[in-house]
C-alpha cells in the first residue's frame, strides 16, 4: 500500500501498515519523528539483547520525538511462529515494550511488505538489499528518509549516537 500505483513512495510517511490487530495505520502520523524500524522475532538468539535495549532506548528518547516500530517476521528459521497479537503480547509483557508492534510481515521476496521493499531499496548493503536475519534496523529521519541500516549484530545501544544526531537534525 502506498501513495498510488504510478507514483513510487519517497518516504516512509507515504505507507500504510497494519497494527497487531490488523487495523490500517497511516505512517504519516510519524512525520517529524525519528524512527527505528526493526524486524523482530521472539525465538531468536538475538531476542533478549535487542528487545531489552530497544525498550531502554525507547524509554530514554520517547519524549524527544523518537519512535521504535517493531515488525514481527517469521522468515528466518520460523522464529516468530505465533500470531501478530502473540508477538505483540510477548514484547509488551516480557520486555515491557511501550512502542508499537505491528502485524507480522515478510521482509524479503516477492511478497515482502511494501514498506520493507522501500527501506531495503533506500539502503542496500554491499551484499545487496536482502535482509539477512532478524533484528535488522533502519534509522529513519524526521523527513521519512532512511538515514542508515544496521545488521543483526549491531545492538540498539551501539547506535544511540546516530539516534541522538538524527534527533538534533532539523
Curated annotation (Swiss-Prot):
Assigned EC number: 1.11.1.9
- From the UniProt annotation, give the residues forming the signal peptide: none
> Where does the record place the catalytic residues?
44
What reaction is this protein's catalytic activity? 2 glutathione + H2O2 = glutathione disulfide + 2 H2O
What's the top EC group for this one? Answer: oxidoreductase
Superkingdom as given in the UniProt entry: Eukaryota
Which GO terms fall under molecular function for this chain's record?
Answer: glutathione peroxidase activity
| Gene Ontology cellular-component annotations | cytosol; endomembrane system
Role this protein plays = May constitute a glutathione peroxidase-like protective system against oxidative stresses.
Stored PANTHER family:
GLUTATHIONE PEROXIDASE, GLUTATHIONE PEROXIDASE 4-RELATED
Q: Give the family this protein belongs to, as stated in its UniProt record.
A: Belongs to the glutathione peroxidase family.
* Name recorded for this polypeptide: Probable glutathione peroxidase 4
**What is the organism of origin for this protein?**
Arabidopsis thaliana
